């Protein structure tokens, strides 16, 4: 449900209604910081049906000029209410996305499918996908990849999912990604931008596809900034041993963190615990498995005794004073005003910088 709301609320011109209880509304509302609406159904509506309440809420919103999207939660789904029949031919987007259908990524993709994106062969530029309002780095990721593309003189197409609703219907034929857990499936996928190696390969493909692009400044920046990363990590390793690291995140961010720390810091990757199903990759250098329960995570941290834990506030609460770095929600107990990226050149710089400082702070 939260993933579906994150997808839909990312598009200007779509009004999102969470059809469920107050609890179903408040979690995405506080996580996404987006203008969501709720039906706040009560006990009698669970028994006698919630259609009247939904019609009332949508009636109040229908004169605002936006398309309305309804995300159904567990109670309406379990009751089997026929939500679509309530609106007939009206242009209401219905996304059945109760919590039991899967992870956040499942709801996101269900909502994106309901929007029916269309590519426009005549549109120049390239789409940016993998953007979710649930991601604490989404704003910085957009800014970083937009900056790189503009430096290469490549126009930007549709941003999935942080754009206007009109742009859903005429996306560019080509796409680059920021977070493959939220891959859009729109157009031809050129490659990802998580980590320096992936960014470099994607830029090579962009240079081949966009003959008018000026990629030299981009490649020069990649090489220069990677040297800075190598120098900083070498300086750290002259004073400290490589850290043992336990990583808990979505598969894309978790594997980025593991690959970057192994490449630049020679870190011992003790575990890569993913919240969603990890991709099947050959020749993995470390243990990768899906871990979705706090008890599993607690037992893993206790058994492996890592120097550094990477994850969310949940993992921080289990880290017992170890060095910690947050890369996935929720990230509680801190102010977040700036828009740091995790993708592109700036994302790797930001990530490695924070890892080094977290480790030094705990060893000082």
Say what each PLM segment does.
Residues 1-364:
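An N-terminal assembly and electron-transfer interface module characteristic of large anaerobic redox
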């Amino acid at each position: 449900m939260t993933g579906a709301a994150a997808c839909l609320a990312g598009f200007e011109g779509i009004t999102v209604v969470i059809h469920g209880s107050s609890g179903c509304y408040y979690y995405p509302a506080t996580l996404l910081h987006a203008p969501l609406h709720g039906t706040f159904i009560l006990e009698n509506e669970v028994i006698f049906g919630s259609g009247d309440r939904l019609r009332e809420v949508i009636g109040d919103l229908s004169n605002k000029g936006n398309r309305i999207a309804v995300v159904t939660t567990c109670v309406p789904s379990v009751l089997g209410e026929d939500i679509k029949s309530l609106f007939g031919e009206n242009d209401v987007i219905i996304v059945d996305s109760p919590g039991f259908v899967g992870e956040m990524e499942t709801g996101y993709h269900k909502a994106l499918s309901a929007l029916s994106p269309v590519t426009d062969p005549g549109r120049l530029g390239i789409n940016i996908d993998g953007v979710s309002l649930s991601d604490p780095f989404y704003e910085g990721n957009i800014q970083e990849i937009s900056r790189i593309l503009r430096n290469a003189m490549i126009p930007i197409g549709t941003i999935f999912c942080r754009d206007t609703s009109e742009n859903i219907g005429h996306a560019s034929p080509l796409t680059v990604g920021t977070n493959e857990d939220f891959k859009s499936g729109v157009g031809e996928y050129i490659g990802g931008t998580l980590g320096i190696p992936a960014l470099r390969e994607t830029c090579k493909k962009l240079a081949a596809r966009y003959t008018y692009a000026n990629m030299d400044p981009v490649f020069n920046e990649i090489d220069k900034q990677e040297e800075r990363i190598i120098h900083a990590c070498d300086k750290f390793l002259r004073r400290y041993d490589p850290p043992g690291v336990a990583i808990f995140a979505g598969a894309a961010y978790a594997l980025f963190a593991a690959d970057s720390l192994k490449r630049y810091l020679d870190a011992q990757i003790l575990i890569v615990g993913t919240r969603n199903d990890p991709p099947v990759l050959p020749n993995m250098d470390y243990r990768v498995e899906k871990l979705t329960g706090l008890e599993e995570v607690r037992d893993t941290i206790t058994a492996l005794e890592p120097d550094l834990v990477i994850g969310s506030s949940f993992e921080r609460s289990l880290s017992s004073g170890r060095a910690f770095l947050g890369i996935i929600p929720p990230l509680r107990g801190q102010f977040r005003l700036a828009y740091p990226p995790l993708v592109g050149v700036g994302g790797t710089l930001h990530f490695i910088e924070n890892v080094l400082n977290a480790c030094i702070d705990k060893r000082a």
